[in-house]
Amino acid sequence: MATRRAIVPEQQQEPSSPASEISKNKDWQEQSEMVSPTEEEGFCWPGPKSVALRRASEGFGFTLRHFIVYPPESAVHTSVKDEENGNRGVNAGRPRNRLEPMDTIFVKQVKEGGPAHEAGLCTGDRIIKVNGESVIGKTYSQVIALIQNSDSTLELSVMPKDEDILQLAYSQDAYLKGNDSYSGNAQNIPEPPPLCYPRVQPEASVMAQPVEVLPSGTSLATQQSSCPLRTATTQPERSYRVEIQVPPSPTDIVKSNTAVCVCNEAVRTVIVPSEKVVDLSSNRTNRAGPLHRTGLADPSILKRTTSPSSSTPNVPMVPSTRHFDSAGVIGKPPSYGGLAENMFSTRPAAHAEESPSPTNHYASPGSHQHIDWRDYKTYKEYIDNRRMLMYGCRTIQERLDSLRAASQNTTDYNQMLPNRSSGQVRRRSTSHDRVPQSAQMRKRSVSQERLEDPVLMKEWPRSASQDTLTSPAVASRNHRSELWDYLTRKGDFDQFIVETHSNGERNTNYQWSGFTEQDDRRGINERPRQHAFHMSLRSPNFTMAPVPFTSSDNRRGGARVLASAHPLQMVHPDMKTIQPTRNFQNSSRAPHPRPALSDRSGFAISKSNSVKIPTPYAAKPHSPSVRSDDGIVRDQKPVNYLHVGGPQNCQRKTQTESALGFHLDSIKTSMSASSSSPSTSQKVDVKITQSPEANAGDSNAVLSPVDQVVLRERPSPGQQTSPPIRQQSYIFAVNEQEGASDTTCWLPNDARREVHIKRIEQRKASGSNSPGDSLASIPFIDEPTSPSIDHEIGNIPASAVISISAQPLPTITTVPPSPTSPVPLMRRHFSHDHDSIRPIVLEVNSKTERSKSCDEGLDDYKEDGKLCLKQGSSLKGIKARENVQSSEDSESRKDSSSDVFSDSNKEGFLYFRQLTTEKGKRVSGSIRPWKQMYVVLRGSALYLQKDKKEQTGHSSAQSDEEQLIGINGCLIDISYSETKRKNVFRLTTSDREFLFQAEDRDDMLAWIKAIQENGNLNDEQTDQASRVLISKRIKEYNTMMSSSSNKTEPSPKAQRQTLSIRQQFRAGKPDDDISPPKDKGSWRRIMKKPFEKKPTTGGTFGVRLDDCPPAHNNKYVPLIVDVCCKLVEDRGLETTGIYRVPGNNAAISSMQEELNKGNTDIDIQDDKWRDLNVISSLLKSFFRKLPDPLFTNEKYNDFIEANRKEDPVERLKTLKRLILDLPDHHYETLKYLSAHLKTVADSSEKNKMEPRNLAIVFGPTLVRTSEDNMTHMVTHMPDQYKIVETLIQKHDWFFSEESADEPITTVHEESTVESQPVPNIDHLLPNIGRTGLSPGDVSDSATSDSAKSKGSWGSGKDQYSRELLVSSLFAAASRKRKKQKDKPQPSSSEDELDNVFYQKELSQVEFQKPDKQNVDKDMDLKAKANALSLKDADNVKGTNIIKEDKLEKDIMYSEPTSPCPPKLLEPPIANHGLQAPSNDKNIPQINFQMEESMSDSGTMLSTSSQASVQGSKPKVVSPEFKGSDFLTADVSSITSDYSTTSSTIYMTGLDSILISPEVQSVAESKGEEADDERSELVSEGRPMETDSENDFPIFASSLAFDRRHQSKAEEPSRNVQVNSEGSPSCTEGSITPKMDRRRFSSHKLIECDTLSRKKSVQQKTDSDCSAESKTEETLSDAQEAVKKGRSLSIVDPTGNNEPEEPAWRIKITERLKLRLKASADDMFGIGSQKANAAETRKKKNIRRRHTLGGHRDFAEISVLNAWKINEPSSKEAELSAVDRLKPKCPSQDLSISEWLVRERLRTSTSELSTVEPEEKHISETTGQKESASASPPPSSPSQVSTAVLPAGSDSPSHETAPQPDDQMNGDSFQSKNKNNFSPAVDAHPHKLSGTQVVRSRFYQYL
């Protein structure tokens, strides 16, 4: 931005063309905004480069940063020279555009790989044009808008960073990391641009701008006028660098700068002769905020309004416009902020002309204008000086900061600087600091300084953005100053009324709202400085007047004092001198060496003399204090008012102020003090200041009172010696002369602060701290100066300080330096707090209330100072100091009548708890419990008091009760892990940690923001401290991560956990609950918590979600969940049956113990983390053991209720609302888990885990209560499934932000819901008796808990109660079942509904299929006949057959998708086998559907889901196809059917009728080996949710099947499914289902125990198989087969669901029937020992548990049943045979396998006729055989059985296809257990893949 040319030295050389220079007479803002291109042209870039970017989805891929560049001093000086040379011409009145601040925009960051990166855009490139449109003159926001509004392509013209003059010149500033001083040697400093900055001699070195005197009529004016501007002739400003900090955002100002001059930028009070007075400042004056005392606004207005029209008629609105260019003000201004005349172009030409002489003053060697970079060791110094001269030392960064609203409440930009106090200490340009020494000081780039010294900024035309951001800098003057001015004026100083100086000029002090919004942003502290500065600048006219240096000495002293006074301003001595010069025409012009302090005092005094500056009002205005000739400076504040002058005036002032600015600095400092206690200052001023003339004549005399306050004489500008602490200009000048103790000398803020701290300490020791003193000691402006520089300053009464600030007069002198001096205490003046102005005496008592901003400033300074003080370098030391000062400040603030205006930036009651001691050791909650404290945030310290203190006399030492916490460089964040309390934030200092609890979140955030802002006041210290803390925190975190501790952050939890109960109680109450308890509930919780089982440190299992170690990327998600889910997603998405197959219990237990020990350093590469089944079981175990389940106990009933809503849309909406209402940890964890489960379900084709299967596994685990409510477990199981399934299916909708869109519901979901409301839990009742662990105890099968869950309920007591419950449930169930026997009751459970639904669908589908397949019809007919016969048999005992048939189907389905198959299979099978005739068409369809569901998921789909699938896609499948496809289940089919019938199915497989529930339950109980999943379910009192997919569906199916079986033959298929799934599920569910079955219903219900089961089994076996002699053998074989997976063969028959077989069924059905008959006979012959079968089942269950072998066994049983069903076609005789086979099934599996093998051989032979089918069958058989051979002999039997079953099923009902499904299921089950569901390739060779089975059977059938 050429405009910033000033920044670019070379370019800067080129004067901007007049065109580009917009007359400054116009608002600077306008100019800044209107940077003319000519300026741009002035730059000699190597040339910008053009970059074209294409907009991508994420945008253009780069971010910008905004810098406001202020013109180099040289440029300003050049313009000044031009003016001096008479070149003002048209532009004379206004600074050139190039001198205007320029908005520069740089590329902050380029996203790698983004469009910008590809286009070659680089970080640091400066944007010149956007789409061909120059950015010059545009605000940052406008440029951003241009970019954002560009089309798909964006053309940028950029200046590469390495070619950008601005960046080269301001390399450090541009990328300032704080305001770090340049650390390199001069040689390393980048060469300044070739442009040589002309050593412009400050023309108005004094910068004595004619002070505009407000009309005496104006109270302000009067006040101000009383003191003519002290034309403190500034010495050459060489080291003068005015750093005016921009106050933080206006809000800050309001917050902190309650003080005077609320005129933020909004109010630019222009001190204009009354005629010209424009209420610019007043308009701009920010009255907002307490800053404006009620009167304040008026004063500012008055100031503006009252500018003496007569006195300064010619002066433009700009108050102290440099009327006296001659005074050098103009010249100075350029150096000052470049404001010089340019800024004050508005000033009348005459004034401008006058300025030349001042310029000459500038010319003085010290003057900044001469600044030549070659004179400085480092470029940075040069820049700093130049900047000081020109911009008030504001760096770009500073300006940016201010623009950014100084996110940090850098109240004291300088305070941060104080850190630099060290040799390099960056001082806010204290006058002395400003000395070339400035090199020592941290150098800021000009822009930085600008930022620091908003005053200058204000005077500068702001860049467009700045303007937009802040009101004219001038406009805002220190509110504090203004306030105190006003107050002073109002109070004692109504006298402030503009006095007519002896010279007759009226001293009208226009208050400048010295602070721009930036100032405000910056913070009160800065403001005070700035304010002071502004005052000095603005008041220069006045302020200077008050302290007019009679000669250059005065001027110089004044300037210097100002500079020192204005901590922010680093003024070169010359510059400072110049500023005073502004006040004094003559003295200001004469660049005299600073007068001795006495001279200064003289200057301060010589109001009229200085005032005599050409601008009449300039002289007058300067005397803010109305010093009548009597020499009493009544109104120092007027100076401030002067500052308030309009922007133009401000410009002039700025120049003047630049000279004065330094002066002002001192003034400002004093002013800050004075602002703090305006009354004090006023009084002081009055006391101190004699008539301006008198003072002028006798500055010493005036200062004499100040003698106590020893102003240090600033080293000559040329001196490199560490600049003495900047004296407040007047005071220094005066005092120095007097040689009063240096104590009075104004130190840079740091020094002052140190001194102040020391004083405070002394006072504390003495117990007396005069508020005034404390103020005085506290540099208002945290002007960094080396503390060492600060000589022990005698306490400068705050009042003195204030006075000084108010009027350069050595008001300070008046105040006794002694800390105790009752000097008017500076009271904070709150806008409301006018009494702040109360008599000094009162104020003394009450630590003067400073205006809030003043106090804050002081406090900040103090605190910063403390921290910043070299001595305070150590945080602890600093803290101590802070404690002292802050306490003082805080007390003063406390004293302040109004808290709002108190020094505190924020205060209020907080609960507080210390986490660590000074040594960093953790403090237990019992030792340091939560306490309610009144917390006051002052500056960089927090004061903790037991209660709110309002006493005004606190300025003395902080009370013992008060605890001080230094927050410089602290880290503050929201605490989540340290306590369970809400709204807690943690404050970490260098050595301690504290927790604070706020009332609500907003309050907490407000505190955090305030503390962050106040803790960042000292750049260097803050940065260093923050770095230390951050590194410390990182170390802690790393330690925590590497150690076994689970705590992410050191947390008191561990200690609390180890505490005794009493201690826990004591600690827990404050720690965990908001104290004190508000109600009984709270007390109860408090009482309960200590006794609740506290998780061990770092515990993961069995602890609340919010206590679990958080994941690395989401603090709300437990680490274990994150790790397990990621591992499964990385490695297990293709693992068949993931989550269904349990892991090794021992491994799971071991990992749980390890994680519970707090080991969060998980090495996922470790072998133990390689077993996915263990990992999946670990995850399930975690959720099972949650004390508060994922869906929370509180909302459990709501979820169940919501799930049962009729309207699916309403249901989903309600569920979503409930989910959103979950606690954060629960919500985020649920969101994460459901997303993971959705990911798993998306891979269901490979892993066979459709949403329904996952829901079966996770439903009871996630949706549960902590209580062992078996009824809920059973009755709500379908709801639990459905809720989880819905979550998985609609994860995106549930967890998306947009909830407006209506959820999309599917038919199957709705049907499921419909089926859910009244789940039939009869089949679960037996399970309840058998198994029962509390949900918490329920463990994954892999976990040790699983055994417990299976083995027992838990403690004896619980067991007993459970038994009672179980017995009652059984009785109810038995009654129900009896009824069901009479008629098929569609149980409320989804299973039954699904079955019914499925049957309907099947019938439809089947009908369709028959149409498709001609063969199907015959088969269907046969199947129907079979089904009918089966029904009859089933009714009789043929149910077993039906069940078998169904089981085949079910197995096929259930194994592929266990949940659905039971239901689906049952109806289809019933339809096919039993009801074949009636449902001829349905059968094929059903088979197909079954095949689909089975093949799809590799597990049985629940019936309802299958039904829905069927409904969704009815189709005919060729037998082969069916065989393979049956397994493929639609996800939809899975969804609707949540059956808990896995055990039932198992029973069905065995022929649930034959096997009594007891037997089944026994088998299941014995089969504790049953899937861990099942055990999990059982343990939870829920159907086995664990690994076997079929468990629940089977249950549901079997229940339904039993009912249906009783009523229909459908039930058997479900039972088959159960079997396929595994005996365990069967056992659990089957007992009930079998009870439903007519035989066992009552008996089984009663008999839950193993004996009963065994008996029933035996009975069944006996009844079923008359020829069971072979049963034992068969049984053993079957057992082996089962163990090895023979069940697969059984499953296969089930898999041969008739739906698939429709086409073949006619043929195959008959064949199968024949075969079945034969096989039935064989089976009967093979073995009919039911007991053996039961044992086999048990074994199978065992296997099932690990593998789904049990299911396979059941599958075999199912196959038998299927054969029986096939036989039913032959007739009930066959059914009886089948029945016999059923008892034999377990053992007969082997025999059956053999039989099947034989049969297959025969079949194959017979079927060879159908070569292809036969071959296929043979291959299948062969495959089976191979697998069998691969596996032990048992496996081969199983294979045989598998083959047999398929054959059997095929012949009866085209079950060949289904059979493969079953087989697949069996395989899949085993696979599932082994995480391998692939039917074709099974982990167990003895298992045949579903496809193989299907093929073999198919061929056999053929």
UniProtKB/Swiss-Prot annotation:
Polar residues biased stretches: 10-22, 409-424, 1039-1063, 1494-1511, 1614-1630, 1865-1878
Region entry Disordered, spans: 1-44, 78-97, 284-317, 348-369, 409-450, 581-603, 613-632, 879-902, 1039-1095, 1306-1357, 1375-1394, 1494-1520, 1559-1704, 1729-1748, 1803-1890
Location(s) in or outside the cell: Golgi apparatus membrane; Cell junction; Cytoplasmic vesicle membrane; Cytoplasm, Cytoskeleton
Arginine finger, annotated site positions: 1140
Annotated PDZ domain residues: 77-162
InterPro entries, A to Z: PDZ, PDZ_6, PDZ_sf, PH-like_dom_sf, PH_domain, Rho_GTPase_activation_prot, RhoGAP_dom
Alphabetic keyword roster: Cell junction, Cytoplasm, Cytoplasmic vesicle, Cytoskeleton, Golgi apparatus, GTPase activation, Membrane
Molecular-function GO terms, alphabetical: GTPase activator activity
Biased composition (Low complexity): 305-317, 1339-1357
SUPFAM superfamilies: GTPase activation domain, GAP (SSF48350), PDZ domain-like (SSF50156), PH domain-like (SSF50729)
Gene Ontology biological process: Golgi localization; signal transduction
A single GO cellular-component term on record: anchoring junction
CDD domains for the chain: PDZ_ARHGAP21_23-like, PH_ARHGAP21-like, RhoGAP_ARHGAP21
PROSITE patterns reported in the protein's UniProt record: PDZ (PS50106), PH_DOMAIN (PS50003), RHOGAP (PS50238)
Occurrences of domain Rho-GAP (ranges): 1103-1295
Major subcellular location class: Golgi
Topological relation to the membrane, as annotated: Peripheral membrane protein
Comp. bias (Basic and acidic residues): 1068-1082, 1575-1585, 1601-1613, 1634-1652, 1661-1673
PH domain: residues covered: 903-1016
Biased composition (Basic residues): 1737-1748
Role summary: GTPase-activating protein (GAP) for rhoa and cdc42.
Protein name: Rho GTPase-activating protein 21-B
Record organism: Xenopus laevis (African clawed frog)
Name of the gene this protein is made from: arhgap21-b
